[in-house]
């Protein structure tokens, strides 16, 4: 076994200030996020995790591997407090900052190509979601899609009303055209 001072130098654990900084950073992100997903990354290579991080950045998702005790402290008092009991094993936390379904969507899409990525739980609005709930969250439309759907629903009655108003005039035109065609035929 090596000398004690060499082992201390190689110790990769965080000092107290670094731990406090990690807790503060994750707590700040959690307080500004709409939803969170906890995933187990066991079995993924560094290259695969890097791809996941790139996909998360593109989707405006905060992705962080945090020790469970530090994550528990960071989530305390936030909407994601309900996740604290399930923080066991090697977990990575993904937070959606803009859209509630962004983190779940990024994780689902990445998980299709990498089955070793396992969704453990999620949280939305202070409610704990099982893995199936995270899948349903991923299927939710984006904000732009939801606005487009709403506009379509709002436009439909107006369009129908406009066609209803135009119908008597169109019917009169068709009747006059039919009479004209009948007179020309005889």
Curated annotation (Swiss-Prot):
GO terms for cellular component: large ribosomal subunit. CDD domains: Ribosomal_L10. It comes from the Bacteria. PROSITE patterns: RIBOSOMAL_L10 (PS01109). Pfam families: Ribosomal_L10. Keywords: Ribonucleoprotein, Ribosomal protein, RNA-binding, rRNA-binding. GO terms for biological process: translation. GO terms for molecular function: large ribosomal subunit rRNA binding; structural constituent of ribosome. Belongs to the universal ribosomal protein uL10 family. Forms part of the ribosomal stalk, playing a central role in the interaction of the ribosome with GTP-bound translation factors. Part of the ribosomal stalk of the 50S ribosomal subunit. The N-terminus interacts with L11 and the large rRNA to form the base of the stalk. The C-terminus forms an elongated spine to which L12 dimers bind in a sequential fashion forming a multimeric L10(L12)X complex. NCBIfam families: PRK00099.1-1. This is Large ribosomal subunit protein uL10. It comes from Nitrosococcus oceani (strain ATCC 19707 / BCRC 17464 / JCM 30415 / NCIMB 11848 / C-107). The lineage of its organism: Bacteria, Pseudomonadati, Pseudomonadota, Gammaproteobacteria, Chromatiales.
């Amino acid at each position: 076994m090596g000398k004690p001072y060499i082992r201390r130098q190689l110790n990769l654990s965080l000092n107290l200030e670094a731990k406090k900084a990690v807790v503060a950073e994750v707590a700040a992100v959690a307080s500004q996020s709409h939803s969170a997903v906890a995933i187990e990354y066991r079995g993924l290579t560094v290259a695969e995790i890097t791809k996941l991080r790139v996909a998360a950045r593109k989707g405006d998702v905060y992705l962080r591997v945090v020790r469970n005790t530090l994550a528990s402290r960071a989530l305390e008092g936030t909407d994601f407090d309900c996740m604290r009991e399930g923080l066991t094993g090697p977990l990575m936390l993904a937070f959606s900052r803009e859209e509630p379904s962004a983190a779940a969507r990024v994780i689902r899409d990445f998980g299709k190509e990498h089955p070793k990525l396992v969704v453990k739980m999620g949280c939305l609005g202070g409610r704990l979601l099982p893995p199936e709930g995270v899948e349903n969250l991923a299927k939710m439309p984006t904000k732009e899609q939801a606005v487009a759907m709403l506009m379509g629903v709002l436009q439909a009655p107006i369009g129908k009303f406009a066609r209803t108003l135009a119908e008597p005039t169109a019917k009169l035109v068709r009747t006059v055209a039919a009479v004209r065609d009948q007179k020309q035929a005889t």
